[in-house]
């Protein structure tokens, strides 16, 4: 990371400097002092005793030498442990189905003071207007919401229909925005490796910022070439040796634990005292139900400590300081003089029990955040409007003809993983030779009037009914899986009627549905209401069979061509290892 860019994110006036230094010297009154607290030392391990002194947005000093410092207000930490605010190194807020405003309300009281967002979900639907809205939300947020400029819209050129483009010229207009930290995940890794000029132009344009990667399972010379292009990190690693090799070659490793992709158990054994500055935590995609019931980055820290015996200072280091350094946010990530006062007070550091949160030097009150949510959302001017340009469908739209004795490709799902396997199944007059095979279809929703792309899905666990959604990465067309064409059509028509959303159909009836009026991706409901609705959706989905833990999130990745091995886009069946379209019938 080029630390010469730190000035971009660390705005402090000369007057603020003078006031801060006066308090640091002991010549002026602090705004806040946190007493009766121990500070977890992320650098040396152990703890630092003594108060934390705050002036404005910044920490003026820490330690016993400030015990008698006067302050306008004192906070009794009651013996709590203080750690830096948590940082999510990579996520798509849209995948939480919450607006950035609602997301802040749900996660800031849990200690998540900083997020590095890639809003490419909404940018794929509505282009620069979606990015501009995210920037407006970030500008007014208490939470530090930083943005990586979406690099691959669509994820892979020529493989899917999406709603908008995001040109290099448009991207450059946002490069110097104070909330922008770099270039978001470069998903077209074959294009980068092969030196496609359009992709290298993007990397060159953002080279003085952070360049995010995306290269699941990549190794050998190809991985070397990808890193040689300037890519600095990857959040897609899912195997221990894969993660180790990326670290050896100089990449920073983002350890992901989301609602669908669960890589923490595989990668946590890599973390040690030596490489932890190169390791970070991220969620990528996490829904409101999990946030409400399990947590966010706090849940990942808890698992590192309890399940993987990671030392406290290392677990909290990878959740804050490592990420801050990687993105050049050197005013964040430590509880030290001159750093921004983003502080989490923990009544139990091992269990990550959050007692109180301060951000930019101010205590956070969850009830105040909730009370202000509606007004702040309105102030951001959300991009409302129906983005579903698709007429209702009928069962005949999903008709597939199979020949007995022929072999057909099946997208084989791995529960709680984003990768799939490519398998095959033989058709007979009695059906397929695997009883777990159901149907999948992707319907473009941007007015192109294409016929549905249809395929076969195995391993998902759907024994009856149908699920449909307008959340399908990254182009966010309509994806539907089902056992019958009639129920698939019913589910699709419900999400069309809702202007986007999620739906469960069983026994010929809609059992549960959730409208998502912003870009077919996000709701304007509160986090609690969303969590309750998702709970109802999941309960209805469970009646359809032994589905993945997060069926809609897992289903959303079945159309993402940049993650292997076999996916279905609006253009057809795509081989994510050969990076080429293939046929449903196996003819080789």
From Swiss-Prot:
Sorted UniProt keywords: Hydrolase, Manganese
Superkingdom, taxonomy of origin: Bacteria
Pfam families xref list: Adenine_deam_C, Amidohydro_1
Cofactors that this protein relies on: Mn(2+)
InterPro entries xref list: Adenine_deam, Adenine_deam_C, Amidohydro-rel, Metal-dep_hydrolase_composite, Metal_Hydrolase
Record-level GO BP terms: adenine catabolic process
CDD domains hit by this protein: AdeC
EC id: 3.5.4.2
Reactions this protein catalyses: adenine + H2O + H(+) = hypoxanthine + NH4(+)
Claim: Transmembrane is one of the keywords in the record: no
Subunit text: Homodimer.
Family label: Belongs to the metallo-dependent hydrolases superfamily. Adenine deaminase family.
Official protein name in the record: Adenine deaminase
Species of origin: Shigella flexneri
């Amino acid at each position: 990371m080029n630390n010469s860019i730190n000035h971009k994110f660390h705005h402090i006036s000369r007057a603020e400097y003078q006031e801060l230094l006066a308090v640091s010297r002991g010549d002026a009154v602090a705004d806040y002092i946190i007493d009766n607290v121990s500070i977890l030392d992320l650098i040396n391990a152990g703890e630092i005793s003594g108060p934390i002194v705050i002036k404005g947005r910044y920490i003026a000093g820490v330690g016993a030498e400030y015990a008698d410092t006067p302050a306008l207000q004192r906070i009794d930490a009651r013996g709590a442990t203080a750690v830096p605010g948590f940082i999510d190194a990579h996520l798509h807020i849209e995948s939480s189905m919450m607006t950035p405003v609602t997301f802040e309300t749900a996660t800031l009281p849990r200690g998540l003071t900083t997020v590095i967002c890639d809003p490419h979900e909404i940018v794929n639907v509505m282009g620069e207007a979606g990015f501009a809205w995210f920037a407006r939300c970030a500008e007014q947020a208490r939470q530090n919401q930083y943005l990586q400029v979406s690099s691959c819209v669509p994820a892979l050129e020529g493989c899917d229909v999406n709603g908008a483009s995001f040109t290099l010229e448009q991207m450059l207009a946002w490069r110097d925005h104070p909330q922008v930290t770099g270039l978001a995940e470069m998903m077209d890794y074959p294009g980068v490796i092969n030196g496609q000029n359009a992709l290298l132009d993007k990397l060159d344009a953002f080279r003085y910022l952070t360049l995010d990667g995306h290269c699941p399972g990549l190794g050998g010379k190809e991985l070397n070439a990808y890193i040689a292009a300037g890519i600095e990190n990857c959040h897609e690693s899912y195997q221990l040796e894969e993660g180790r090799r990326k670290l050896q070659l100089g990449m920073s490793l983002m350890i992901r634990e989301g609602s669908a992709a669960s890589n923490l158990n595989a990668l946590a054994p890599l973390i040690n005292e030596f490489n932890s500055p190169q390791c970070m935590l991220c969620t990528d995609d996490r829904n409101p139900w999990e946030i409400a019931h399990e947590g966010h980055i706090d849940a990942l820290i808890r698992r590192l400590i309890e399940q993987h015996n990671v030392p406290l200072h290392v677990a909290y280091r990878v959740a804050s300081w490592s990420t801050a350094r990687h993105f050049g946010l050197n005013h964040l990530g430590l509880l030290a003089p001159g750093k921004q006062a983003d502080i989490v007070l923990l009544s139990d550091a091992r269990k990550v029990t959050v007692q109180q949160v301060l951000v930019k030097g101010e205590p956070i009150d969850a009830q105040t955040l909730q009370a202000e949510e509606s007004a702040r959302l309105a102030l951001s001017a959300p991009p409302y409007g129906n983005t579903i340009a698709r007429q209702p469908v009928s069962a005949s739209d999903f008709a597939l003809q199979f020949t007995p004795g022929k072999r057909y490709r099946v997208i084989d799902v791995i529960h709680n993983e984003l990768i799939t396997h490519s398998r095959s199944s033989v058709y007979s007059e009695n059906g397929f030779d695997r009883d777990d095979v159901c149907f999948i279809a992707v319907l473009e929703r941007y007015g192109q009037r294409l016929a549905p792309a249809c395929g076969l899905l195995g391993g998902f666990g759907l024994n009856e009914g149908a699920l449909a959604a307008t959340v399908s990465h990254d182009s966010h067309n309509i994806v539907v899986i089902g056992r019958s064409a009639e129920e698939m059509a019913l589910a699709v028509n419900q999400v069309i009627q809702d202007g986007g959303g999620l739906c469960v159909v069983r026994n010929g009836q809609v059992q549960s549905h959730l409208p998502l009026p912003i870009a077919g991706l996000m709701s304007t409901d509160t986090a609690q209401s969303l969590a309750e609705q998702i709970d109802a959706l999941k309960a209805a989905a469970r009646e359809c069979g032994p589905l993945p833990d997060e069926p809609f999130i897992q289903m959303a990745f079945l159309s993402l061509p940049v993650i292997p091995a076999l996916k279905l886009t609006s253009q057809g069946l795509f081989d994510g290892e050969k990076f080429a379209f293939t046929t449903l019938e196996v003819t080789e």
